[in-house]
Every structure is written in structure tokens, then in C-alpha cells.
Amino acid sequence: MFDDQDLGFFANFLGIFIFIMVIAYHFVVAEPKFE
């Protein structure tokens, strides 16, 4: 199974991935407003 180090790495990766997805989504949604 997972140990604490693997779980921490997975949590960090998931958090960073979600953060990047939110930023990308914000750019895609907000971009037309600048034109």
C-alpha cells in the first residue's frame, strides 16, 4: 500500500494539478473580456 511519503507526494501533485487547472480555466474564461 502507500506510505506517508507516497501519500504526501500524491497530495502535493494533486493539489498543484488542480491549482494549474483552475488558473488555466480562469485564463480561458477571462480572456475574451480583455478584447
UniProtKB/Swiss-Prot annotation:
It is a single-pass type III membrane protein. Pfam families: Ost4. Keywords: Endoplasmic reticulum, Membrane, Signal-anchor, Transmembrane, Transmembrane helix. Residues 1-8 are lumenal. Residues 30-35 are cytoplasmic. GO terms for cellular component: endoplasmic reticulum membrane. InterPro entries: Oligosaccaryltransferase, OST4_plant, Ost4p_sf. It is found in: Endoplasmic reticulum membrane. This is Dolichyl-diphosphooligosaccharide--protein glycosyltransferase subunit 4B. The gene is OST4B.
